[in-house]
């Protein structure tokens, strides 16, 4: 029996192998990695749930692969009938299996990419496709490229040490994988990497194989579904875990690589440790826009938590540094200080190392011992404040400023250099100094974000209380006049007797929390929906009134298309106010939002408007002599401004970055950017290299005739997009039927509600669920809608325009990136799948609507390829094509399962014939039956809700971008 079994399994696996795409090149290990993980997974599935379940999963895979090969829609129906015949327990097991197999395919892909990079480093550059625009910027290659463009090494070094990239981590509700699983995936990745190492012994191999099996099984046995929504504190802790695991050690490691790259172009200096190359900020616990769960208490907790973590991370490293610093030779300044501290030392028995008095011939250790005491106290103070709000640790026993913390470390550094021990100084001590300069005492700077309307409410309460009228009814000029007269005066505006609604109290309490915490805990105060100068002045006034001694910089955020268009004028009006110019000291930051502008007008018009707005803003800033920093609020998906980092940076308009870049790293992208050490390194390298290159070798400015054509196309694209999304009276109804948008809220991804207002149409829906829903059905409507109409109309008007579009694609980075990203989305899309959702879920009279959209999809795809000069989608990127082909059968199965399950949830009259349970030994306590019990509170038939949520998570993993 066992032998026959094995034979049968092998033959099915052989069949599966035939369905997999072929290798692309010598360096292509992807098929092997994928096969290994898949085999391990199927063996585990058979052990846990029996042979029939394994066979069923393989049959589903084959039917789906068959559909992906020839797009025969009958196969989708066959697959649908197979999946709906399962009982609730089996349905969850099968869905979970496909979701897991997809995650494993993603891991195989990551290991393959890392492997090819290593090979490329060893072979150095014989990859034709690696040189194309789709690869990232290696710091060393970037420096060499700049020298080829006739920059001197000194100019490059000067630009590099003066630039800043500030990465702002946000807890957008799109990280749909639980942390428990992310950690297991990390270990699977490690096992896989080691298994294919050259010098591996048979014993090692066997142990690694066992570890691999163990981790795959542990991941499969973990409940993928969050049963309760995360709180903002949970999101913050999840975000902070990346500092712990990769970013903390990753920054000094990356800066060493920059030093090496500089050495290779003839610069024998290191990047100064206080050069602010990389900075980190966060929105977790500070972003209250539309999230009532972020209260002033949350903001306070999050700041104290980050300070405690920072002190803890330094503390865990300081003893290692003390071990290294055993030298006796030092300069006079240090010797005097060390002697003074050695004599004043109390015993330190609660430390593990160096607990007795430090001997006189170890002066560095005496200095660092004092630093250790202060770090211990700093951590304790933050911990006590966090748990009870009070602390018995006096303030003079802790570090209160970064300069105070750097001073003894700088003293050690100077002393070593004075005594000829520079190589020692440039070891761990330099790394430590760089960490202190990058992370400070606060670990990350917290941005506060609030809607402009909420500030107006507070001021309205104040003016009404003062009896001078209603602030909200005043004109913009009157508001400005009053705000400026108050800002120039000294009198307090209101006392404790101000009558406050809950909302007003919340805004004022937030300012109060800011005034009570150390100012280095905070970054910017961002005002969403900002339209006028009074929005900014209002925040300046409230900061002063609430006693914030070191006010946060105020950053207006422009999101909707109309706001972007009027942003330059609004900023010019702001700069024309003398009081404000004196306040900002020649520096201003402006944030531009990608998600809402895309939802508002479609991708083409939004991208072009963002481009033009940045150019205009830079002009305005130059006119007033202000240095402008653009803060890019990009999402993870293409519909929300996502896409490969280096390309996005290099396609920004010339002069808009100037060595200062601030950009959000959102939810699901945090894991892709910082989940592993090598990913963290790559992310820091990409941002730094691309920012440097953009500043020193800016992309070309578009020719005047390109601009005219873009303007024309943007108008047509907006018109087409809005005619469907906003003007079509039954569009919202169609959207809610054709996608899982209504079910999205059950995923418990984020702490933020998915709608701004409970009822209402597309306007009130957040940009994230809007895109999430279209990504699920693989129709990606918000990304491509508008492109087709625009291309078609300008080509019909004048056939020469086609050649101009081709010229734009070949010569203008911005246009190329915009088109390439849409092409990538077409590679992941499948109108056949969208048609299946329509057929099952959309009422008959709305069916033609979907058909029309699918015709538009195909037409847009055809025109896009024509403009790009490609015969087929992704013909220039065989690797990406192969990777997408590998994933397709898994995603197709999950899509079919989702569509049919939604049908069962929404249509009580939809009857299915359930087949007997797959595992022979079925009883109430079997593994499959227990899965159904994980969700006892569901309002649907057993198992349906979990099945839908699992398909959502699986498809999100397959698309590699959720919202």
UniProtKB/Swiss-Prot annotation:
GO terms for molecular function: phosphoenolpyruvate carboxylase activity. It is found in: Cytoplasm. By light-reversible phosphorylation. The active site is at residues 172, 599. Keywords: Allosteric enzyme, Carbon dioxide fixation, Cytoplasm, Lyase, Magnesium, Phosphoprotein, Photosynthesis. PROSITE patterns: PEPCASE_1 (PS00781), PEPCASE_2 (PS00393). Its cofactor is Mg(2+). The modification Phosphoserine is found at residues 11, 701. Expressed in all plant organs, with higher levels in stems and leaves. Belongs to the PEPCase type 1 family. This is Phosphoenolpyruvate carboxylase 2. It comes from Arabidopsis thaliana. The gene is PPC2.
């Amino acid at each position: 029996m066992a032998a026959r079994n094995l034979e049968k399994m092998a033959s099915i696996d052989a069949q599966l192998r035939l369905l997999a795409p072929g290798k692309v090149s010598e360096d292509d290990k992807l098929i092997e990695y994928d096969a290994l993980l898949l085999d391990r997974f199927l063996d585990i599935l058979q052990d846990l749930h029996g042979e029939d379940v394994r066979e069923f999963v393989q049959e589903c895979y084959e039917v789906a692969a068959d559909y992906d090969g020839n797009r025969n829609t009958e196969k989708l129906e066959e697959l649908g009938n197979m999946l709906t015949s399962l009982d609730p327990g089996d349905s969850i097991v099968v869905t979970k299996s496909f979701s897991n197999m997809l995650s494993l395919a993603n891991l195989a892909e990551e290991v393959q990419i890392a492997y090819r990079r290593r090979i490329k480093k060893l072979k150095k550059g014989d990859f034709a496709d690696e040189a194309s625009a789709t690869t990232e910027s290696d710091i060393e290659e970037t420096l060499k490229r700049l020298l080829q463009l006739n920059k001197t090494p000194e100019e490059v070094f000067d630009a590099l040490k003066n630039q800043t990239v500030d990465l702002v981590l946000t807890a957008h509700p799109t990280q749909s994988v639980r942390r428990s699983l992310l950690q297991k995936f990390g270990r699977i990745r490690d096992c896989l990497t080691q298994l294919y190492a050259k010098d591996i012994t048979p014993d090692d191999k066997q142990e690694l194989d066992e570890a691999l099996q163990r981790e795959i099984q542990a991941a499969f046995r973990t409940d993928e579904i969050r049963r309760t929504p995360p709180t903002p504190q949970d999101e913050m802790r999840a975000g902070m875990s990346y500092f712990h695991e990769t970013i903390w050690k990753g920054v000094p490691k990356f800066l060493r690589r920059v030093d090496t790259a500089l050495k290779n172009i003839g610069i024998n200096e290191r990047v100064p440790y206080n050069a602010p190359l990389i900075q980190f900020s966060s929105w977790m616990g500070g972003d209250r826009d539309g999230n009532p769960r972020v209260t002033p208490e949350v903001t306070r907790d999050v700041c104290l938590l980050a300070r405690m973590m920072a002190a803890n991370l330094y503390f865990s490293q300081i003893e290692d540094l003390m071990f290294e610093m055993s030298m006796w030779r030092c300069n006079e300044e240090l010797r005097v200080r060390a002697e003074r501290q050695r004599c004043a030392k109390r015993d330190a028995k609660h430390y593990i190392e160096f607990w007795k008095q430090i001997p006189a011939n170890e002066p560095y250790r005496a200095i660092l011992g004092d630093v250790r005491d202060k770090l211990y106290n700093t951590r304790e103070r933050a911990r006590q404040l966090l748990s009870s709000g009070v602390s018995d640790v006096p303030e003079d026993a802790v570090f209160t400023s970064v300069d105070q913390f750097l001073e003894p470390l700088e003293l050690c550094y100077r002393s070593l250099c004075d005594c000829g021990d520079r190589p020692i100084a440039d070891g761990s001590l330099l790394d430590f100094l760089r960490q202190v300069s990058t992370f400070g005492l606060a670990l990350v700077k917290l941005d506060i974000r609030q809607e402009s309307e909420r500030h107006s409410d507070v001021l309205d309460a104040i003016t009404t209380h003062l009896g001078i009228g209603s602030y909200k009814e005043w004109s913009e000029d009157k508001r400005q006049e009053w705000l400026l007269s108050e800002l120039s005066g000294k009198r307090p505006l209101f006392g404790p007797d101000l009558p406050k609604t809950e909302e007003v109290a919340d805004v004022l309490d937030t300012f109060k929390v800011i005034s009570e915490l150390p100012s280095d805990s905070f970054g910017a105060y961002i005002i969403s929906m900002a339209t006028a100068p009074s929005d900014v002045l209002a925040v300046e006034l409230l900061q002063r009134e609430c006693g914030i001694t070191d006010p946060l910089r105020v950053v207006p955020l422009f999101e909707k298309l109309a706001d972007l268009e009027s942003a330059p004028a609004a900023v010019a009006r702001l700069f024309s106010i003398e009081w404000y110019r004196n306040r900002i000291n020649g520096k201003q930051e402006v944030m531009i939002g990608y998600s809402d502008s895309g939802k508002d007008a479609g991708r083409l018009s939004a991208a072009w408007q963002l481009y033009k707005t940045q150019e205009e803003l830079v002009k305005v800033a130059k006119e007033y002599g202000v240095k402008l920093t653009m803060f890019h609020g990009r999402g993870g998906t293409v519909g929300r401004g996502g896409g490969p980092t280096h390309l996005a940076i290099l396609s920004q308009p010339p002069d808009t970055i100037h060595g200062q870049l601030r950009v959000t790293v959102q939810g699901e992208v945090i894991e892709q950017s910082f989940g592993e050490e090598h990913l963290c390194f790559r992310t820091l390298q990409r941002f730094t290299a691309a920012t440097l290159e953009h500043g020193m070798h800016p992309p070309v400015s578009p020719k005047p005739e390109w601009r005219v054509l873009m303007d024309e196309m943007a108008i047509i694209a907006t018109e087409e997009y809005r005619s469907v999304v906003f003007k079509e009276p039954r569009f919202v109804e169609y959207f809610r039927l054709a996608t899982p948008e209504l079910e999205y809220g059950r995923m418990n991804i984020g702490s933020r509600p998915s709608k701004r207002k409970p009822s209402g149409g597309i306007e009130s829906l957040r940009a994230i669920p809007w895109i999430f829903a279209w990504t699920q059905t693989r129709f990606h409507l918000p990304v491509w809608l508008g492109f087709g109409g625009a291309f078609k109309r300008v080509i019909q008007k004048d056939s020469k325009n086609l050649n101009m579009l081709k010229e734009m694609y070949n010569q203008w980075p911005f246009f190329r990136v915009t088109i390439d990203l849409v092409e990538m989305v077409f590679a992941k899309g499948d109108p056949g799948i969208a048609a299946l959702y329509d057929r099952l879920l959309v009422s008959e009279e709305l069916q033609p609507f979907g058909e029309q959209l699918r015709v538009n999809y195909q037409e847009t795809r055809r025109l896009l390829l024509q403009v790009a000069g490609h015969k087929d989608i992704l013909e220039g990127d065989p690797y990406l094509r192969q990777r997408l082909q590998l994933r397709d059968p898994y995603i197709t199965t999950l899509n079919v399962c989702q569509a049919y399950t939604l049908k069962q949830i929404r249509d009580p009259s939809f009857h299915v014939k359930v087949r007997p349970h797959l595992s022979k030994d079925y009883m109430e306590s079997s593994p499959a039956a227990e899965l159904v019990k994980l969700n006892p509170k569901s309002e649907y038939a057993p198992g349906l809700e979990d099945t839908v949520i699992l398909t959502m998570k699986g498809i999100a993993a397959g698309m590699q971008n959720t919202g």
